[in-house]
From Swiss-Prot:
It is an enzyme of class 2 (transferase). CDD domains: AdoMet_MTases. This is Ribosomal RNA large subunit methyltransferase G. It comes from Streptomyces griseus subsp. griseus (strain JCM 4626 / CBS 651.72 / NBRC 13350 / KCC S-0626 / ISP 5235). Belongs to the methyltransferase superfamily. RlmG family. The gene is rlmG. It is found in: Cytoplasm. HAMAP family: 23SrRNA_methyltr_G. Its EC number is 2.1.1.174. Specifically methylates the guanine in position 1835 (m2G1835) of 23S rRNA. The lineage of its organism: Bacteria, Bacillati, Actinomycetota, Actinomycetes, Kitasatosporales.
Length: 384
């Protein structure tokens, strides 16, 4: 937990889930710069009396600081939502002060102030601006914020194409602001997302089926090479086993398990609302008739009963925004051990340099290498 002092007040903030030894803060200079801009006497304070929409607030720092203005927070991240609720409570703020919407929810009809934390994915930025543009009017104040290394010419072009004329601020503490002036004359076009592609011929049971990808999921325009390698080495199971695609992305791992064993009961889990929507559409498009599946947006396997799962398939992320970390993978591995029955198995694909085998041996007491190439390795751990 750390203290965030702004012109709106001082707040105690933490990421979610909170880890006592987590070196990363729940806010950064880009959040601070944006909040300063809203009260800058040089440009005149921004009128926050109308509908304020905060998009992509990573850990609730912006929503918490602006809670007095009853903002709408729009996020693709379940963990960001939980962080926001926890940070509001931590600072004695009623959770009803912030209206929480997911990236898949219908946005407000009218937005008077649109504050955008620039995401890593330009596709996600494009999709969200397309969805929000109908609510923007000629008087809407539109401000984006991000670290300098997150904002590129391509970022500005997206704002300009969808919202209107766009300029940037000077950099302050390696953060920069984006100012867009809404142009009502711009044509209102639909988002090009989701994107669909046919799975290649060398990936086992799902070859030739369709993957559906909403904006913002990892490697949304093609099958990522780690998943492609994993698909060639997935375990085979028969009967009414329960299989979880953990951190499912577009769901092709779980789909492969369902196609290979139509009697299996699949559960797709991700903390991204867009990912779970992608997985559900991928499954509906390619699964055998009668195949059974659940789709959960959540914090790993926390919502599953302990000892209820036979097989977990996992391609864990190793980035948290711009930071490289194995914390998410370790949390997923520990959650998988809890969710698995005795004799149940966790299968993982990862880059060789991440050394996931050390974490699996520590958590499960065992780890076997199933397959590998110069870049990737498929690992198997069994709950004893």
């Amino acid at each position: 937990m750390n203290r965030f002092t702004t012109s709106q007040g001082a707040f105690e903030l933490a990421r979610f889930p909170e880890h006592p030894r987590d070196p990363f803060r729940a806010w950064d200079a880009a959040d601070d710069y944006l909040l300063q801009q809203l009260t800058d006497p040089g440009t005149g304070p921004v009128d926050l009396s109308g509908t304020v929409a905060v998009v992509g607030d990573r850990w609730g720092a912006l929503a918490t600081a602006l809670a007095a203005h009853r903002p709408v927070q729009i996020s693709d991240s379940y963990l960001a939502r939980r962080a926001t609720l926890a940070n509001l409570a931590r600072n004695g703020i009623d959770e009803d002060a912030v209206r929480l919407l997911s990236s898949r929810d219908t946005p407000p009809d009218r937005i008077d102030v649109l504050l955008v934390r620039v995401p890593k994915s330009l596709a996600f930025l494009e999709d969200q601006l397309h969805r929000l543009a109908p609510a923007v009017h000629s008087g809407t104040v539109v401000i984006g914020t991000g670290m300098v290394k997150e904002i590129h010419t391509s970022t500005l072009k997206i704002f300009e194409r969808i919202i209107g004329p766009t300029r940037t601020s000077l950099a302050v503490r390696k953060a920069r602001l984006i100012f867009s002036t809404p142009d009502p004359a711009l044509p209102r076009t639909l988002s090009p997302w989701p994107y669909r592609y046919e799975l290649p011929a060398d990936v086992g049971p799902v070859a030739g089926l369709t993957a559906v990808n909403h904006a913002g999921i990892f490697c949304a325009e093609r099958l990522d090479i780690g998943t492609r390698f994993f698909l060639k080495h997935l375990p085979t199971r028969s009967g009414a086993v329960r299989v979880v695609d953990l951190g499912c992305g577009n769901g092709v791992l779980g789909l492969s398990a369902a196609v290979a064993n139509p009697d299996a009961h699949l559960t797709f889990v991700d903390e991204s609302y867009g990912a779970v929507a992608s997985a559900e559409e991928t499954f509906r498009a390619g699964a055998p008739a009668g195949a059974k599946a659940d789709f959960l947006v959540g914090d790993g396997l926390a919502d599953l009963d302990p000892g209820s799962v036979d097989l977990v398939l996992n391609n864990p992320p190793f980035h948290s925004h711009l930071a490289t970390t194995d914390a998410t993978a370790r949390t997923m591995f520990a959650g998988a051990k809890t969710a698995l029955r005795r004799g149940g198995e966790l299968w993982v694909v990862g880059n060789r340099h991440l050394s996931y085998h050390t974490h699996l041996r520590r958590i499960f007491g065992n780890c076997t290498t199933v397959a590998g190439d110069p870049k990737f390795v498929v690992l198997r751990a069994v709950k004893r």
